[in-house]
Amino acid sequence: RMGMPGLMDILKQIADMWENNRQKILSAGDEITNTIQPRQELNAPVNTVNTETLRKGYGQLKKSFDAKWGGFGAAPKFPTPHHLTFLLRWGKRSAEPFALKMVKKTLTAMRRGGIFDQIGFGFHRYSVDAKWLVPHFEKMLYDQALLAIAYIEAYQATKEKKFAVTAQEIFTYVLRDMTDPNGGFYSAEDADSEGREGGFYVWKRKEIMDHLGEKEGDLFCRFYGISDKGNFEEGFSIPCISLSLEDFAKQEGMEPGKLEKDLMNSRRRIFVLRGKRIHPLKDDKILTAWNGLMIAALSKGYQAMGDKKYADAAVAAADFILAKLRGRDGRLFRRFRHGDVAYPGYLDDYAFLVWGLIELYEATFEVSYLEEAVALNKAMIDIFWDKKGGGLYFTGKGNETLITVSKDAYDGALPSGNSVAALNFLRLGRMTGNVDLEKRAEQLIRSFSGDINVFPMGYTHLLSAVDFIAGPAQEIVIAGDPAHKATKSMIRAVQEKFLPNKVVLLYNDGPEGKRLEALSPFVK
């Protein structure tokens, strides 16, 4: 057609070339493979990754920070919560107030923007504009988990309640809409509804007014920026907040508590109305890696805020993954859907789940979760570790054979498996007294040190591991009966604080204590 060969003609040519020029094709394949392989590491390793690297990473983030709207760089804007969690650590280390200012500005702006579902909660994937107003409306499980962690740590660092409330809202969404009855968490919700991007989430002012009435509807629309003109396509409005509750209450001459209660009641009524729409398609596969992130987030949520339903949900998910997505040989699978388990696990499945199990141990002090973390961490090293150059490959024994194997530490929309693994090594090393794990973390970081030192802003989760190594780190052993009031008070005192470079063990007499001794002999 139009002078171009058809598919059948191309297939015949391929068959002919394979029959008559096989060696030439194989040689070309080898040449391509050899060309690709060296690009896996663009900068040779150097010996130094230290607090100066952290300082450089902070400087790059500061330079790219959007002082007006928060976040980093120009549109489209992704949340990149590991930038924020690194800045919290750097702010604590350096006492640099602007680090915390960037975190607070970004978290506040995102919560007020259209990137956050103001009616049903949870974050959309990214913003197409600089001011967080118009999102790509898809919702991803990993964004909910990583952003919840950022808001929780910001709450621990500042004690500003609004950050805790946002984390609670994220969990409300996940536990309501993204949780399988058996305990795992679903992957995503689509952007489209009824054939229109964002159709489920946007509103006409008349629709709100007809449902809430003149006075209540007008107040709701003005607070959430819903107008006749609209701020989106075709006169629709994406709910967003331009003034804080306190400033809006002052403008309206209202008591903030009364305004908050009225808006909450109106929002609930609109949420019920929205429920009559056709819901976006749910991607109901359960991924080991992303479930690991949500287990970590819920566990940290319980530690910081003390709501037992978060710990219960994390336990249910961890038990589900360990029961359904692990083979008899102890290796993980990647995906579960409607009873079907598929694909050997990749690096991030192991690294992210180990992270979740470490946090779950520190939330519940159930030794079994620390045992599982240690075992899966060992399996991960056996399967993915690069014995020659250090670091972990994304694929390993049992995964599909590729023409090139990827080994990367870049922290993009998600932190990399290597970055998460490095911090896991450090924490498990301190929790169990295994110095070799800490050395392995240093070796991993050194293997990527050339790239890290060139562009540390691209490795902010790995920088959190560097921050841990730089110290000081706290190894806290609480001895006592977990049911005893004094023990509970000590646990709460530790968990409420922002202590990013800590590990916590609970030791008591009895079977649990003996199991902990087997993992961590120094607690005796």
Regions found by a protein language model. Give the residues of each.
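Glycine/proline-rich, flexible active-site/cofactor-binding loop segments
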Residues: 84, 103-106, 311-314, 318-321
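Glycine-rich, acidic and aromatic/proline-enriched surface loops and short helix-turn segments
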Residues: 109-116, 316-324
